[in-house]
Amino acid sequence: MRSITPVVFLALVVACAPAPQGLRAADEGPGPKVSFDVFHTPLPEIPLPNDFATRFDALSPTKRRINASIEVAPTRWERRIRAALDDISGWGTLAPITVSFSEPLDLRELTRRHQAPGDLADDALYVFDVTRGSPGFCQPVLLDLGQGHFPVVADDRTYFPEEPHDALESLLFEQQEEDLNGNGVMDPGEDTDMDGVLDHPNTLDGKTGGPFDVIGFYEHETNTLIARPLEPMREATTYAVVLTKRLVGKDGKPVRSPFPAINHLSQTQALGAVSECLSTQALGLDDVAFTWSFTTQAITQDYIAVRDGFMGMGPLAFLKDKYPPEIATLEEARRSEGRGTNTKIVPGAQFANLGEQLLSFVGGSDVTDGSKELIRGWLRSIDFFAAPTMVSPQFFPRNDSEGKQLPFYEQTMKLDPLRGIAETRDETVPMFMAVPKNRTGPAPVVIFVHGHTGSKLDSIIFMGPMARFGIATIGLDAVSHGVGINDADISLFSGIVETYGITPLANAILKGRAWDQNGDSIPDPGADFFSAYVPHSRDTVKQTAFDVIRLVRVLRSFDGKRTWKHDVNKNGMADDLAGDFDGDGKVDLGGPDVPIYMAGASLGGIMSSLVGGIEPEFDAILPILPGGYLSEIGACTALGQVKNPLVLRLFAPLFLVRDGPANPTLSVMYPSAVKNVEVKLASLPTLPPGSIAVMRNLKTKDWRCARVQKNGHLRLAVPSDEGDRLQLELYDQELPSQEKTGCDPTGVTPVKVVDTLDREVKFLGTTIPAGSKLTAFADGYGLRRGSPEMRRLLALGQIALESSDPANFAPFYDGTRTLTYGDGSTVKTRALLVPMTGDPGVPISTANALMRAAGFLDVRKVDPRYGKSTQQQLIDVGFVEGVERTRRYTDAMGRPVLMDADVLQSVRAGADDGFGAPRLNPPMRLFGPSEKIGGTVGALLPYMDPKGAHSFPIPDPGKSFDLGSLLLNIAGGYLGSGGTRVAVEACAERSNCDWFPPIPP
């Protein structure tokens, strides 16, 4: 098993080898020293990312693999996740760059130098591309060091019950002052969160402040500088981080190298271009205090290999024959009405009334009578519906050789093109399809992906507007997704559809890829899609991308010549043209030259913005509620269906006492699919406020401490594998402080030990009898909020997620970076991104990062409308922060509101959304013609709710301003024009533009 040993071994070899030369000798003297301690526990303390912590692998595309220090992880499941990291070919392209010091830095001097990201003349820190031959050779990476591109203020500040430090603004950084008497010493009782550290606010000056004062570019507790790339770095490329002498401590002295030279001697060759790169900034090696190198991972190789494989090329060429481009089944859609009835489709007219009810099901109470009338008109543009399926190769396993489901941390892709490894299994991908009327040939197609925990049924709101513009819509279920309803709801649903004679279509729609993940007999869509099992989450995203790429191949195969096995014309022969769903002898959609688009919302917005940068066949994409920097989405989202499986797993097992002090009861909280479950375990004696509880993991010999709060409540956790024996100990005296564990109970006798359940417990479908030993019911990291461990783990998570992160693929849209396949095709995709102002689900800051990566937001260029860059303008007006409770702005009633940056209501005189929000003047309007690929590209910034919203507005012509109709008509017009027209026009809001295709009677 690999461990920390290779890193230590390299350190010893270099120490004992003949002295090689560094770039130059380091300066002597005082000043904060860079921390570089490979023996530090629990993890080495070195600047990261760093090629010092990689190992050679001849079959890696970069000749490197990460060494993630497997042995130091306390639990089996964390070791397996770290082992998956060891397979990655290099460091992150978006992940933070961190370096710790022996003493605090002068943060005001640092922020003064780094105020303007585009002005690098006097920066203290640089990151250069030092790979000769790279298109970005010697170009500096733009960095955020507190300029506001990555706000730390979370929309939902609550991260589960009984937090010892409540009302923190961030998941990652401390805000509480524990040194109550200001003596600089941890006095008894001051360590209220029992982390073994005297906490101070993570603000610029370390003093208590408001929400805007918390900083994310520096961690006071560890003296760690945290730099965030503003744009994705290039894949499989070596970079140098250069700390200049301008980076100083509080005494004004420059930071120092930990070595006799300004670099580790093993990296001198890799850093050979640093002097040349520094000269571009009028600097030289004499200006350098310390430098190190790192190599980014390859992020495109799997997509290239799989797509080429589908076309019979490259190391995975077998995929073409094993998975030919074909529709596997055409599901029954309606009852037969006599001989010759095509039961594989439902005519649009037969579906119309049901479609209206389904839209009400999807849209809820927002669907008004006016909405229904408008929707009925759109649905009249649909010729027929169908429910095809395809078989798609899945590159990660679900079960072991005996058919038992694998833990999620073992459900990772067995895909390594350079080694010729591609283990696949078959999985049926169900789809829901609508084909427009008035076709003069095969219809263009938009592939629509639903939101997280949704299904292909969500595409119904898109189908009518797309059909009006002559576009067919295919909704597909992403990995692990489908309609998640219980038997009673299924019966109700079936009863409704039976009235319309299309029960078979309803049954086909209900077939999905979701399954019961928590033992309640109800499918749990998406429960494992975004979770703390990060390599698995990465691979669910990648697999969904592969499914979409395969669907594109299927659509392109409808060439008007090939036949398929489906006898839709009922002549008893397999002579129907592939793609002829209605049996009229003509291909209905797709084909070699027909435009193909992609769209989706939330998860679908993430998927369409990802695959839009991967698949060359897309003419245009329309991601709604999209975002990049996936680890940031996970850490900052307010969506419970993501917070529970991801963030709660980081805290779990979360032991709570919530009903003290009279009758305290110990309970535990875990994720339950996309929800959480809390079960009571045992009664406890009265817990005096300020007393201490210790939870021990008897298997790992690890423990954590917590202090009983003033109200008698308690919260504590310990890292655990499922099944580990645990023991709660209660103490009535102060225990010595200890870092990591929080306290040291050695030699002190607890007043009470709880290691047994005093009642029957039901957990995720399992009954545990009273008298059973206290165990961990599931895996959990047992982390604390606002801790360096949490921050480091999320940084590792971003490294694991890079190959599935849309922001990494956005530069491919317009060819700013080139992605070319074996058939010579190159990605050139027109994109219109539609994030929602103040989105708390896919935080608007992550959509902002995606827009920046795509080139739709400029960091360097001054926009004459504002006298600053568009990016800086959005930061300054609070758009990037996107949290109204900070009260940057209030309405006439004094209620907190967000700034409206695009002012879409101004498209029509007299339109009013009624929000009374401040409006940016002039509106931002981040879209326009593309010089590189033609057409129109960019982003819209709709304002749906003054507090922000993670949803799409239902069209309602009865409103003074109908944002829903405007956006759907913009979507239809954009894709219908091949990505050339963005109809921010009054007639689009009223659905009556003279250039709109007429709605059939």
Map each language-model feature to its residues.
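Acidic, low-complexity Ser/Thr/Gly/Pro-rich repeat segments typical of extracellular/periplasmic
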Residues: 18-391
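Short, solvent-exposed loop/turn and secondary-structure capping segments
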Residues: 110-114, 137-140, 238-242, 250-262, ...
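Acidic, glycine-anchored loop motifs typical of Ca2+
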Residues: 171-204, 501-525, 560-589, 714, ...
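N-terminal cap/lid segment of alpha/beta-hydrolase-fold proteins
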Residues: 350-441
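C-terminal motif of bacterial Sec signal peptides marking the signal peptidase cleavage site
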Residues: 14-15
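Cap/lid segment of the alpha/beta-hydrolase catalytic domain
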Residues: 395-420, 428, 440-443, 447-567
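Primarily recognizes the serine-hydrolase "nucleophile elbow" in alpha/beta-hydrolase
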Residues: 573-636
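C-terminal subdomain of alpha/beta-hydrolase-fold enzymes, centered on the catalytic histidine
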Residues: 532, 536-543, 610, 616, ...
